[in-house]
């Protein structure tokens, strides 16, 4: 290889490494170890139009990411897997611990976590605006989701989670 070829190869390799530091690609495969959804491997696929019940990969925004990390629920940089419960135009309410969507009860929030620490609580009703989504894993009563932190911007959605291999306790 000529000296010019070595210089160009080194330049291209350095440029590639440098550019990779600027971009944070979404993983194509993730492992879920939490009990909110079945433990296992999930493929991360692009999201089209959001649909009720769809399982999403969500990157928690600040200050939620810091809260999750400080409480040791989820380290920073690790995504959440949550289901779509309400979409723009729908009214989501929290009255005491009851969550309703368009007047229908959809679940209950806990007041304290497993370590007896108080959980965040919001009150009132909110009609989701364009660009907002309400995420809740109804099958898991202790899932840390929108019943505690409210609606999230759709910009936090990293993709759709499709199960590849999961293990459900029976």
Regions found by a protein language model. Give the residues of each.
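Extended hydrophobic leader/signal-anchor segments used for secretion and membrane insertion
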Residues: 1-170
């Amino acid at each position: 290889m000529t000296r010019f070829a070595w210089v160009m190869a080194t330049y291209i390799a350095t440029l590639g490494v440098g550019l990779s530091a600027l971009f944070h690609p979404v993983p194509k495969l993730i492992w879920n170890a939490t009990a909110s959804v079945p433990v296992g491997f999930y493929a991360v696929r692009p999201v089209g139009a959001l649909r009720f019940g769809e399982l999403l990969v969500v990157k928690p925004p600040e200050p939620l990411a810091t809260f999750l990390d400080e409480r040791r629920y989820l380290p920073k940089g690790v995504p959440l897997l949550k289901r779509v419960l309400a979409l723009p135009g729908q009214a989501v309410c929290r009255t005491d611990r009851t969550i309703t969507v368009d007047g229908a009860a959809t679940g209950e929030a806990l007041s304290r976590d497993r370590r007896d620490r108080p959980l965040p609580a919001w009150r009132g009703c909110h009609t989701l605006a364009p660009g907002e989504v309400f995420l809740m894993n109804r099958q898991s009563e202790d899932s840390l989701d929108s019943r505690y932190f409210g609606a999230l911007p759709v910009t936090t959605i990293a993709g759709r989670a499709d199960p590849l291999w999961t293990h459900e306790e029976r």
